[in-house]
Structure formats: structure tokens, C-alpha cells
Amino acid sequence: MATKKKTFEEAIAELETIVEALENGSASLEDSLDMYQKGIELTKLCQDKLQTAEKRMAKVVTDTGEEIPFEADGE
């Protein structure tokens, strides 16, 4: 079964949960390291999604600065 890709919002929510758990300090060292590693992966995912969004937004404006209509995928 294929794994569903996380949305930006899902990744941020999971990252916030991890940060709260790490700040709490009640997890074992091993669990903390696992959460930290997952947090790094989620951070990279979020950065990639933001870069993709930035590139899409850059295409909305032509080189001359003239705005063109923005159409989201599937609309």
C-alpha cells in the first residue's frame, strides 16, 4: 500500500507535537533521538514544499512585472 504524502499543514502539526514532546523532557534518550531525526525529516519536507510554492508564485508574474492570472492545479 502506497504511503500518502503529508501536506505542509500535516507536517507542521507533527513537527509541533515533536517539539512539545522534546521540550517536555520526559522521553528517553533513544526516543528523543528518534523524534529529533523525524523532526529533521519533517523540516526538510516543509522547506521543500515552501520552495515549490515559491517557484509556482514566481511564475505568476512575468519577467516584465506584469501580473498574470494564477490558476491552482485542478481548478
Swiss-Prot record:
It catalyses: Exonucleolytic cleavage in either 5'- to 3'- or 3'- to 5'-direction to yield nucleoside 5'-phosphates. Its EC number is 3.1.11.6. GO terms for biological process: DNA catabolic process. It comes from the Bacteria. SUPFAM superfamilies: XseB-like. Keywords: Cytoplasm, Exonuclease, Hydrolase, Nuclease. Belongs to the XseB family. Bidirectionally degrades single-stranded DNA into large acid-insoluble oligonucleotides, which are then degraded further into small acid-soluble oligonucleotides. Heterooligomer composed of large and small subunits. This is Exodeoxyribonuclease 7 small subunit. It comes from Listeria welshimeri serovar 6b (strain ATCC 35897 / DSM 20650 / CCUG 15529 / CIP 8149 / NCTC 11857 / SLCC 5334 / V8). The lineage of its organism: Bacteria, Bacillati, Bacillota, Bacilli, Bacillales. The gene is xseB.
